[in-house]
């Protein structure tokens, strides 16, 4: 019975570590994805502003 408890405890411990590592990796991936989306939003807002500014300066 003691051997069974040790085995189950070891399995539980390894599964907990595995889940923790997966969660950290998932969070890191979400942060990278959020940065990419944020950069795309900045480009969308910035490029029309520059275009309008150039049109105003060139008088077209």
From Swiss-Prot:
Pfam families: FSAP_sig_propep. InterPro entries: Frog_antimicrobial_propeptide. The keyword Transmembrane does not apply. Residues 1-22 form the signal peptide. Residues 23-43 form a propeptide. GO terms for biological process: defense response to bacterium; defense response to fungus; killing of cells of another organism. One of its GO terms (cellular component) is extracellular region. Expressed by the skin glands. It is found in: Secreted. Keywords: Amphibian defense peptide, Antibiotic, Antimicrobial, Cleavage on pair of basic residues, Cytolysis, Fungicide, Hemolysis, Secreted, Signal. The keyword Ubl conjugation does not apply. Antimicrobial peptide active against a variety of Gram-positive and some Gram-negative bacterial strains. Has antifungal activity against a slime mold isolate. Has weak hemolytic activity against human erythrocytes. Belongs to the frog skin active peptide (FSAP) family. Temporin subfamily. This is Temporin-CG1. It comes from Amolops chunganensis (Chungan torrent frog).
